[in-house]
Amino acid sequence: MPIFFYLFATLITISSVCVVLSKNSVYSVLWLIFAFINGAGLMILLGAEFLAMMLIVIYVGAVAVLFLFVIMMLDMHFNKTITQLKANLALSIFIALIMFADLVIIILLGTKNINFNSNVSFTITNNISNTKAIGGVLYTDFMLPFQMAGLILFVAMIACITLTLKKREGVKRQDISKQLRHNKENTVLMTKPILNKGVENIKYE
């Protein structure tokens, strides 16, 4: 069992690094799918088959595939993105150094000073399935973090929608409120043209 743990953990680490370093967003999503699959393998080793199935069905089958289609449909200019990243290179390096320092501190100090909540029990027996045990802990002891996670996902969904709202020049769009305000006084114009002459000085909206 330890050899499988180290195998899945190593593959997750490699795929996570490739997600960040890949220049093509499509390749990043494919590496992310690979990381989710290895994460499901770790869940199986822990005896949580339900979580492993949810990782495959929801994250790989729905979320990651949705990311893939959204990236493929968006008109993303990679050269422009690289230019923007170079403009914020100093800030990016500073944040990366802070995160790296946090990881070093955690590795050196370990988890000795972390007080775990001993009141939270997560026991799986023959009478209680892992689905029931996870649901009992998730919706009782961790109800507030669960709601916050849902709120974060909701904000991320709104952000994905706003990415598709690009204003393009020369594209005519419908103004529903303006159409509903129209009546016969401002849409129908009665005129009497002169014989053999066209109608001039008419403004169209």
UniProtKB/Swiss-Prot annotation:
The keyword Cell membrane applies. NDH-1 shuttles electrons from NADH, via FMN and iron-sulfur (Fe-S) centers, to quinones in the respiratory chain. Couples the redox reaction to proton translocation (for every two electrons transferred, four hydrogen ions are translocated across the cytoplasmic membrane), and thus conserves the redox energy in a proton gradient. Keywords: Cell membrane, Membrane, NAD, Quinone, Translocase, Transmembrane, Transmembrane helix. PANTHER family: NADH-UBIQUINONE OXIDOREDUCTASE CHAIN 6. GO terms for molecular function: NADH dehydrogenase (ubiquinone) activity; quinone binding. It is found in: Cell membrane. The lineage of its organism: Bacteria, Pseudomonadati, Pseudomonadota, Alphaproteobacteria, Rickettsiales. This is NADH-quinone oxidoreductase subunit J. Belongs to the complex I subunit 6 family. It catalyses: a quinone + NADH + 5 H(+)(in) = a quinol + NAD(+) + 4 H(+)(out). InterPro entries: NADH_UbQ/plastoQ_OxRdtase_su6, Nuo/plastoQ_OxRdtase_6_NuoJ. The keyword NAD applies. Its EC number is 7.1.1.-. Coiled coil: none annotated. NCBIfam families: PRK06638.1-4 (NF005164). One of its GO terms (cellular component) is plasma membrane. The chain crosses the membrane at residues 1-21, 26-46, 54-74, 89-109, 142-162. It is an enzyme of class 7 (translocase). It is a multi-pass membrane protein.
